[in-house]
Amino acid sequence: MGSLPPPSLDFSSIDHNSLKNGGSSHQEISHDNLLNLFKSQQDLLNHFFKHLDLSQTLDFSRILLSTTGTVFFTGVGKSAFVANKVSQTLVSLSFRSSFLSPLDALHGDIGALSPRDVLVFFSKSGATEELLRLVPCARAKGAFLVSLTSVSGNPLAGVCDMNVHLPLQRELCPFNLAPVTSTAIQMVFGDTIAVALMAARNLSKEEYAANHPAGRIGKSLIFKVKDVMKKQEELPVCKEGDLIMDQLVELTSKGCGCLLVVDEHSRLIGTFTDGDLRRTLKASGEAIFKLSVGEMCNRKPRTIGPETMAVEAMKKMESPPSPVQFLPVVNEDNTLIGIVTLHGLVSAGL
């Protein structure tokens, strides 16, 4: 076997100051230069908006809206990231959509395509070899093919059923190479189409929330009081005849800041808070040792039902005359079934 010649080690030409700065020379980014870059990018995006063919865009939107199958998106490199993102946006809006890798498609994944589907190609140049190889295979599956390109007369546009031209004056990159404007245009185009489809389908806020159960908007429209309340052994419960001093552990150990006073049938009588404890101690002194919870509790507390939306519980806590930190949860006959706390609502992401 052959071998590589030994390296020639010459350290005399090394710029040690350059090494300290990461191995390359840098210039400061000035305020004016940065501002000019943003203005230039704005001008490039304005060129896109000014020259976009709305008739092409409308036809494309209607095809996506009317498809009875799945809308697949594909691309290579940075365009692949855009294609994937736009696809996921549509999925979040209850549209059947998916990203199709052009490489994986040629190794089995193209089996997902059917004659009812639409395949959308994101490509700046329209000359990407991987996408051109995919076209005849996708056509054999019967899918409708759409290219979104920025170069006129490109080969991909010529072999697809439809092309939408995304006008691009140039890239912001000083070499006109890095796809920093073309991808922005692709993203703006894709997301705007997604919103147009959303409006055409009359997607409701409730449907949107159902697709985002972990997000704040989803939780606010899905979670009910019964989903976030404490219950059973978590409740700081006592009877009205119990002495205040005998219930200090119950008052302080359940993390609710209160006692829930109930009768023998678990119907709510009132509440006694840690604030009530401080006020009673200040007003009564040693007499507090003989006072029962029932004598000092609030017999008209705010309450809420288990089927009420959790976000409404938060509003009720914050309503006049003064905010509260908790709400006892009762059913129709005032039987205590839980407690919802402000801390619990915040922890749930509401």
From Swiss-Prot:
It comes from the Eukaryota. Residues 229-288, 297-350 form the CBS domain. ATP binds at residues 75-80. The record marks 78, 130, 171, 212 as: Catalytically relevant. It is an enzyme of class 5 (isomerase). PROSITE patterns: CBS, SIS. Keywords: ATP-binding, CBS domain, Isomerase, Lipopolysaccharide biosynthesis, Nucleotide-binding, Repeat. Residues 60-203 form the SIS domain. GO terms for molecular function: arabinose-5-phosphate isomerase activity; ATP binding. Substrate binds at residues 94-95, 107, 133-142, 167-169, 295. Its EC number is 5.3.1.13. GO terms for biological process: carbohydrate derivative metabolic process; carbohydrate metabolic process. SUPFAM superfamilies: SIS domain (SSF53697). CDD domains: CBS_pair_SIS_assoc, SIS_Kpsf. It catalyses: D-arabinose 5-phosphate = D-ribulose 5-phosphate. NCBIfam families: kpsF. Belongs to the SIS family. GutQ/KpsF subfamily. Catalyzes the reversible aldol-ketol isomerization between D-ribulose 5-phosphate (Ru5P) and D-arabinose 5-phosphate (A5P). This is Probable arabinose 5-phosphate isomerase. The lineage of its organism: Eukaryota, Viridiplantae, Streptophyta, Embryophyta, Tracheophyta.
